[in-house]
Protein backbone atom coordinates (compact mmCIF):
# COMPACT_ATOMS: atom_id res chain seq x y z
CA UNK A 1 0.00 0.00 0.00
CA UNK A 2 1.46 3.38 -1.01
CA UNK A 3 2.17 6.19 1.44
CA UNK A 4 -0.46 8.35 -0.28
CA UNK A 5 -3.16 5.72 0.21
CA UNK A 6 -2.20 5.31 3.88
CA UNK A 7 -2.23 9.09 4.37
CA UNK A 8 -5.65 9.47 2.73
CA UNK A 9 -7.07 6.59 4.77
CA UNK A 10 -5.79 8.10 8.02
CA UNK A 11 -7.07 11.56 7.06
CA UNK A 12 -10.52 10.17 6.23
CA UNK A 13 -10.68 8.25 9.51
CA UNK A 14 -9.54 11.29 11.49
CA UNK A 15 -12.10 13.48 9.73
CA UNK A 16 -14.91 11.06 10.62
CA UNK A 17 -13.81 10.76 14.24
CA UNK A 18 -13.52 14.51 14.75
CA UNK A 19 -16.28 15.42 12.30
CA UNK A 20 -13.70 17.62 10.61
CA UNK A 21 -13.92 20.09 13.43
CA UNK A 22 -10.50 19.76 15.03
CA UNK A 23 -9.43 22.80 17.03
CA UNK A 24 -12.78 24.58 17.09
CA UNK A 25 -12.98 24.57 20.89
CA UNK A 26 -9.52 26.13 21.10
CA UNK A 27 -10.42 28.82 18.57
CA UNK A 28 -13.73 29.66 20.23
CA UNK A 29 -11.89 31.12 23.22
CA UNK A 30 -10.14 33.64 20.97
CA UNK A 31 -13.21 34.84 19.09
CA UNK A 32 -15.27 37.93 19.81
CA UNK A 33 -18.17 35.66 18.79
CA UNK A 34 -18.28 32.10 17.46
CA UNK A 35 -21.83 31.36 16.36
CA UNK A 36 -24.11 28.50 17.27
CA UNK A 37 -23.84 25.65 14.81
CA UNK A 38 -20.81 27.19 13.09
CA UNK A 39 -18.14 24.76 11.94
CA UNK A 40 -14.55 25.12 10.76
CA UNK A 41 -13.20 21.95 9.14
CA UNK A 42 -9.66 20.78 9.88
CA UNK A 43 -7.00 21.58 8.78
CA UNK A 44 -7.33 25.34 9.09
CA UNK A 45 -5.00 28.20 9.97
CA UNK A 46 -6.79 30.89 11.95
CA UNK A 47 -4.82 33.79 13.42
CA UNK A 48 -6.78 36.23 15.56
CA UNK A 49 -3.68 38.41 15.96
CA UNK A 50 -4.29 41.62 17.88
CA UNK A 51 -7.73 42.03 16.33
CA UNK A 52 -11.18 40.48 16.54
CA UNK A 53 -12.96 37.65 14.75
CA UNK A 54 -16.74 37.34 14.64
CA UNK A 55 -18.27 34.27 12.99
CA UNK A 56 -22.07 34.25 12.82
CA UNK A 57 -24.44 31.34 13.38
CA UNK A 58 -24.65 28.23 11.15
CA UNK A 59 -21.67 29.13 8.99
CA UNK A 60 -19.55 26.30 7.56
CA UNK A 61 -15.93 26.77 6.49
CA UNK A 62 -14.40 23.81 4.66
CA UNK A 63 -10.83 22.58 5.18
CA UNK A 64 -7.67 24.34 4.06
CA UNK A 65 -8.81 27.82 5.12
CA UNK A 66 -6.39 30.57 6.13
CA UNK A 67 -7.92 33.49 8.03
CA UNK A 68 -5.63 36.07 9.61
CA UNK A 69 -5.51 39.51 11.20
CA UNK A 70 -2.08 41.06 10.64
CA UNK A 71 -2.46 44.27 12.66
CA UNK A 72 -3.60 45.41 16.08
CA UNK A 73 -7.29 46.26 15.87
CA UNK A 74 -7.95 44.32 12.65
CA UNK A 75 -11.57 43.22 12.42
CA UNK A 76 -13.01 40.23 10.55
CA UNK A 77 -16.76 39.61 10.52
CA UNK A 78 -18.43 36.68 8.76
CA UNK A 79 -22.23 36.64 8.94
CA UNK A 80 -24.84 33.95 9.53
CA UNK A 81 -25.47 30.99 7.25
CA UNK A 82 -22.40 31.37 5.04
CA UNK A 83 -20.79 28.46 3.17
CA UNK A 84 -17.09 28.81 2.43
CA UNK A 85 -15.35 26.35 0.11
CA UNK A 86 -12.00 24.59 0.29
CA UNK A 87 -8.77 26.58 0.41
CA UNK A 88 -10.34 29.92 1.38
CA UNK A 89 -7.89 32.75 2.26
CA UNK A 90 -8.80 35.94 4.11
CA UNK A 91 -5.88 38.26 4.90
CA UNK A 92 -6.73 41.37 6.87
CA UNK A 93 -4.87 44.50 7.96
CA UNK A 94 -7.96 46.68 8.27
CA UNK A 95 -11.54 45.40 8.24
CA UNK A 96 -13.28 42.67 6.26
CA UNK A 97 -17.04 42.26 6.57
CA UNK A 98 -18.94 39.40 4.93
CA UNK A 99 -22.74 39.52 5.11
CA UNK A 100 -25.25 36.75 5.76
CA UNK A 101 -25.85 33.71 3.52
CA UNK A 102 -22.86 34.31 1.28
CA UNK A 103 -21.69 31.35 -0.84
CA UNK A 104 -18.00 30.99 -1.64
CA UNK A 105 -16.67 28.38 -4.06
CA UNK A 106 -13.18 26.93 -3.54
CA UNK A 107 -9.87 28.82 -3.40
CA UNK A 108 -11.25 32.33 -3.00
CA UNK A 109 -8.83 35.03 -1.80
CA UNK A 110 -9.98 38.16 0.03
CA UNK A 111 -7.38 40.68 1.12
CA UNK A 112 -7.66 44.13 2.66
CA UNK A 113 -3.89 44.64 2.63
CA UNK A 114 -0.95 44.95 0.32
CA UNK A 115 2.75 45.70 0.67
CA UNK A 116 3.94 49.20 -0.05
CA UNK A 117 5.26 49.53 -3.61
CA UNK A 118 7.49 52.62 -3.50
CA UNK A 119 10.43 51.82 -5.81
CA UNK A 120 12.39 54.82 -4.44
CA UNK A 121 12.33 53.46 -0.90
CA UNK A 122 15.49 51.86 0.47
CA UNK A 123 13.27 49.07 1.77
CA UNK A 124 12.34 46.04 -0.28
CA UNK A 125 8.66 45.71 -1.15
CA UNK A 126 8.43 42.93 1.42
CA UNK A 127 9.78 45.24 4.15
CA UNK A 128 7.65 48.28 3.29
CA UNK A 129 4.68 49.07 5.56
CA UNK A 130 1.36 47.44 4.71
CA UNK A 131 -1.20 49.54 2.87
CA UNK A 132 -4.78 48.62 3.74
CA UNK A 133 -8.38 49.44 2.90
CA UNK A 134 -11.61 47.75 4.12
CA UNK A 135 -13.46 45.10 2.13
CA UNK A 136 -17.24 44.56 2.36
CA UNK A 137 -19.33 41.79 0.79
CA UNK A 138 -23.12 42.11 0.95
CA UNK A 139 -25.77 39.59 1.94
CA UNK A 140 -26.64 36.70 -0.33
CA UNK A 141 -23.71 36.93 -2.75
CA UNK A 142 -22.23 34.03 -4.71
CA UNK A 143 -18.46 34.23 -5.18
CA UNK A 144 -17.09 31.86 -7.83
CA UNK A 145 -14.05 29.60 -7.73
CA UNK A 146 -10.57 31.19 -7.55
CA UNK A 147 -11.93 34.74 -7.29
CA UNK A 148 -9.56 37.39 -5.86
CA UNK A 149 -11.14 40.33 -4.02
CA UNK A 150 -8.65 43.14 -3.48
CA UNK A 151 -8.36 45.97 -0.91
CA UNK A 152 -10.99 48.70 -0.83
CA UNK A 153 -13.68 46.74 -2.66
CA UNK A 154 -17.37 46.75 -1.72
CA UNK A 155 -19.57 44.10 -3.33
CA UNK A 156 -23.29 44.82 -2.99
CA UNK A 157 -26.00 42.40 -1.96
CA UNK A 158 -27.09 39.42 -4.10
CA UNK A 159 -24.15 39.84 -6.50
CA UNK A 160 -22.52 37.02 -8.47
CA UNK A 161 -18.79 37.09 -9.20
CA UNK A 162 -17.64 34.81 -12.02
CA UNK A 163 -14.91 32.20 -11.52
CA UNK A 164 -11.27 33.38 -11.58
CA UNK A 165 -12.29 37.06 -11.55
CA UNK A 166 -10.06 39.70 -9.96
CA UNK A 167 -12.27 42.29 -8.28
CA UNK A 168 -10.52 45.67 -8.06
CA UNK A 169 -13.54 48.02 -7.97
CA UNK A 170 -16.94 48.17 -6.28
CA UNK A 171 -19.80 46.07 -7.63
CA UNK A 172 -23.33 47.51 -7.09
CA UNK A 173 -26.24 45.50 -5.67
CA UNK A 174 -27.83 42.80 -7.86
CA UNK A 175 -25.04 42.65 -10.44
CA UNK A 176 -23.01 39.92 -12.12
CA UNK A 177 -19.33 40.77 -12.58
CA UNK A 178 -16.58 38.76 -14.24
CA UNK A 179 -13.10 39.06 -15.71
CA UNK A 180 -9.63 40.32 -14.85
CA UNK A 181 -10.13 43.02 -13.84
CA UNK A 182 -13.76 42.23 -13.09
CA UNK A 183 -16.43 44.39 -14.70
CA UNK A 184 -20.20 44.36 -14.38
CA UNK A 185 -21.70 42.38 -17.27
CA UNK A 186 -25.31 42.04 -16.10
CA UNK A 187 -27.70 43.73 -13.69
CA UNK A 188 -31.01 42.38 -12.42
CA UNK A 189 -34.08 44.29 -13.60
CA UNK A 190 -36.90 44.03 -11.07
CA UNK A 191 -39.45 45.26 -13.62
CA UNK A 192 -38.70 42.59 -16.24
CA UNK A 193 -37.53 40.00 -13.68
CA UNK A 194 -34.48 39.23 -15.80
CA UNK A 195 -30.71 39.60 -15.69
CA UNK A 196 -29.94 42.15 -18.40
CA UNK A 197 -26.65 42.94 -20.12
CA UNK A 198 -25.01 46.21 -19.16
At which residue positions do the language-model features occur?
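Beta-rich strand-turn-strand
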Residues: 91-93, 97, 145-160, 165-168
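Short acidic/His/Gly/Ser-rich catalytic and metal-binding motifs that mark active-site loops
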Residues: 117-121
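Extended, non-globular alpha-helical segments
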Residues: 109-111, 115-116, 130
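A short acidic, glycine-rich active-site loop
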Residues: 124-135
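Domain-scale signature associated with acetyltransferase and cell-envelope carbohydrate enzymes
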Residues: 1-111, 138-139, 157, 173, ...
Amino acid sequence: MSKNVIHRSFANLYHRLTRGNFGTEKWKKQFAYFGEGTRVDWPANINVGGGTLHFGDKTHILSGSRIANFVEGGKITIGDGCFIGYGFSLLNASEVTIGNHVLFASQVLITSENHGIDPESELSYMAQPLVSSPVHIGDGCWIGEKVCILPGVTIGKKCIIGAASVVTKDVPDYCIAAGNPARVIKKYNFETHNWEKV
